[in-house]
A protein has these predicted regions:
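Hydrophobic core segments of alpha-helical transmembrane domains in multi-pass membrane transport
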Residues: 20-37, 72-79, 100, 104-106, ...
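Membrane-interfacial amphipathic/re-entrant helices at transmembrane-helix boundaries
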Residues: 2-74
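Helix-loop-helix "hairpin" substructures at the membrane interface of multi-pass membrane proteins
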Residues: 127, 188, 194, 202-281, ...
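Transmembrane alpha-helical segments in multi-pass inner-membrane proteins
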Residues: 261-267, 271-340
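Single transmembrane alpha-helix segments in multi-pass membrane proteins
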Residues: 36-40, 53-109, 122, 126-141, ...
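Cytosolic-side transmembrane-helix boundaries in multi-pass membrane proteins
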Residues: 1-25, 240, 247, 251-254, ...
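Short loop segments and helix-boundary regions at transmembrane helix junctions
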Residues: 7-19, 83-91, 110, 119-188, ...
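Transmembrane helix-bundle core of multi-pass membrane transporters
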Residues: 54, 59, 151-226, 367-370
């Protein structure tokens, strides 16, 4: 019998991780409900019921959950991958934005098919991820500072480029809007992601495409890279101790850069699949897109586990879709606050992991003393 099998169930890292995430979600939901009671006591039960039931109320709503979960999953994978290698990729939003721009550039300006546009999104995100990696590896500049700066640089650069590329905007394709990109169903239907084999199951919902399949494949691929390859071992070794990794002959500078490049590519794919769905257009923004930041609680809730990221992103997407059904009993601002509270508390998985571990260790110590 292996050591893993001899280990008590509640002391296994995987079990503790799952329990920590579930406990965090429960605490977040409870505090969210308390907040609803404080704001509008009479509608609190109905509001929470709407939040928890809407996602399964119809196949169209479930399709929307999957649609929103796909880019969220990619951003969660991006942040989690960097976490695993000892880096904090707070620049996922900028990489997401550049991925969206590169993919739309290929779709609208160059009239390329969806799979090329998707690859372009990965390239755009990777390019925007390489800068924080280089500054960290060769100048020891904190990647958080660099990444935040590049979030804003990326947003304003995309705005500048789009404003000077009339053919990219909706106004260049017969629409009156000049503050957003052209609709793909008009500019290049071939760049829209295929509906996939399950579209009929969802009643041909406009939200359904192959993006959720693509993201699950990437989650599995990232897990394999981190857990089953020498390259993944080297990346994690650099994350645990850069000096020890160098002593062992691992090129830590190269791995830091590669980690941020891969992390950026994952965020870039997230931006690509969101806009290549064909259901929305990129609007010239005045503030940083929130999707990249939403990847942080996804990664924390999943404890940076790529497989856990699948379920964490689905949960957060489900809560967001359900929150929209709480109107008119609650204002949109109130709903955003409640969702933020739930997501923030759900991200306390690491804290809950420590609490569970201490509780189990204390119980084991008492049993040993009794014997």
């Amino acid at each position: 019998m292996s050591k893993q099998n001899k280990q008590p169930l509640l002391q296994r890292p995987a079990v503790v991780g799952v329990l920590a995430s579930l406990l965090s979600i429960v605490v977040g939901l409870v505090l969210g409900f308390v907040l609803l009671v404080l704001l509008n006591p009479g509608a609190a039960v109905g509001g929470m019921r709407a939040m928890l039931a809407t996602g399964f109320s119809s196949m169209d709503k479930l399709g929307k959950v999957l649609y929103q979960a796909a880019p969220l999953m990619m951003c969660g994978l991006s942040v989690g991958f960097a976490f695993k290698t000892g880096l904090f990729n707070i620049g996922a939003s900028g990489q997401y934005t550049m991925g969206a721009f590169f993919s739309l550039l290929c779709a609208i300006q160059f009239q390329l098919p969806w799979y090329v546009c998707l690859l372009a999104g990965a390239v755009g995100g990777a390019i925007w991820g390489v800068f924080p990696g280089l500054f960290k590896a060769y100048f020891n500049v904190n990647e958080v500072i660099t990444a935040i700066m590049f979030n804003w640089i990326g947003m304003y650069l995309v705005n500048l480029l789009l404003a000077n590329m009339p053919n990219m905007l909706a106004s260049g394709w017969g629409a009156s809007n000049s503050d957003r990109t052209a609709a793909l169903n008009v500019a290049n239907p071939g760049a829209i992601l295929p509906r996939g084999p399950f579209a009929a199951l969802f009643g041909n919902s406009s939200w359904i495409n192959i993006s959720i399949i693509i993201t699950i494949i990437f989650a599995i691929l990232v897990w394999v890279i981190l857990q089953k390859t020498t390259f993944g071992y080297e990346l994690k070794a650099c994350g645990l101790s850069r000096d020890a990794a160098q002593y062992a002959g691992i090129n830590s500078k190269r791995n830091i850069v590669l980690s941020m490049v891969i992390s950026g590519a994952l965020s870039g794919i997230g931006g690509a699949i969101y806009y290549l769905a064909g259901t929305g257009q990129y609007v010239l923004e005045k503030s940083i897109l929130g999707m990249g930041f939403n990847g942080i609680p996804v990664a924390l809730l999943a404890s940076s586990n790529p497989i856990g990221t699948i379920f964490a992103s689905l949960f957060i997407s489900y809560i967001q879709v359900g929150g929209a059904a709480m109107q008119p009993a609650y204002s949109s601002e109130t709903i955003d606050i409640v969702i933020a509270v739930i997501i923030s508390l759900a991200a306390f998985a690491r804290l809950m992991r420590g609490i569970i571990t201490k509780a189990v260790s204390g119980h084991k110590g008492k049993e040993g003393a009794a014997k």
